[in-house]
Amino acid sequence: MSEPADLQLRTTELLQRLIRFDTVNPPGNEQAAQEYLRDLLDGAGFEVELLSSVEGRPNLIARLAAESDGPALCLLGHVDTVLANAAEWDVDPWSGELRDGQVWGRGALDMKSQVAAEVAAAVALAEAGWRPQSGELKIVVTADEEAGAVHGAKWLCEQHPDKVRADIVVNEGAGEVFEYDGRRIYGVCVAEKGVFRFTLTTEGRAGHASIPRIGDNALTKLAPVLAALASTRVVLEPSPEPEAFLEAIGVDATDLGKALAEVEAVNPAIAVLLEPMMGVTLAPTMVSASEKINVIPSRARLKVDCRVPPGLGEEHALERIREAVGENGYEVEFDETVVGNRSPIDTPLMGSIRAFVEREDPGAQVTPLVLPGFSDSRWFREVFPDCVAYGFFPQKAMDLFEAAPLIHGANERVPVEDLGLAARFYSDLVQETLG
């Protein structure tokens, strides 16, 4: 497949430019970055428009269509980022500095790197005269992903479905290589867990804190709940993605408990990442009680981040909560409920990814993953049920365990070698899918 010789350089320079746009969300302020991308794509022959639900926070949609019908391939990304504390960094987080073969800055991994690779690949192809033989290529770059996508992908899919409708979506979520028992493996995010955050409330009786027994302390009633949550392990539940993951690393998935124990014995770090894919997780994160230090609280609240396997809902979450902490002495109220979703594993897109990995890293394998959180892919799956949406940004120079702590962390950076790798993948995929 044809690829410009300077694709890695073009991607690197574009990423540096994107990092220099401060798009920390909130407030986001994605306008300037999106206008820069618009001009690049427009100059290469794409039909481009910016759509906003609020002023200053546009989403970009770029199209390059064939005259004949065919699949719609969407390369998806977002340009907003989380905050960076400059005092914790070795470089200016918005400098896009190139140091030791890596581009540094907020968004270098999440996910201006992927946006740069997708756009650079698309622009290079278009400038070289490539056009789809059938179907269409869409580049969709969203705002507001880091704050729930209310002004981004969610809004686009719900309010402008005809403009972003796609058969195939490639987004963020996986792609870094990792090793297990001598195998090199690249993950592909094919599903995302649901979010069922809840508040657990205990009741007591207020009183003056100088006489502790005069009241009934609601806060201390949370102690056994916290202890129970601390000791709770994930109830392992059969589902296609973790079973395929186990198969890829050569572990028998017949007994999930034995399988997880085997992985933990061989590589504990992999087990830590695998376990959340296999069932409901419950993580207590916030506590509130009395508003005054000298008042025994009559009510105490514990907030718990609950993540549920794709396709399962509130009833299933509540069942696992009751199993973990019992049923008496408290109330549970769900504050946020989002059902996770998935795409099929065996698809032409997965075949394209496997073929690319074999070309670039002979002998390496590919495995599906479940993203413990969620990304913009979930909105596309929800609104377009037949859409196949995967997360894949291939990284060979920086492995999973080096990359993971840098995402949303200090000194976020990405090797230029991986920028070139990813851009080649998107270029190859576009030509293979659309002709």
Regions found by a protein language model. Give the residues of each.
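Acidic/His- and Gly-rich active-site-bordering loop/insert found
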Residues: 2-108, 115, 125-135, 304
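An extended, acidic, His-containing surface patch that forms the Zn2+-binding/catalytic region
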Residues: 46, 68-70, 177-179, 234-294, ...
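Short, solvent-exposed loop/turn segments at the edges of secondary structure
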Residues: 57, 91, 134, 164-165, ...
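A short core secondary-structure module
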Residues: 154-156, 209-236
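Short Gly/Pro-enriched turn/cap motifs at secondary-structure boundaries
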Residues: 35, 50-52, 145, 177, ...
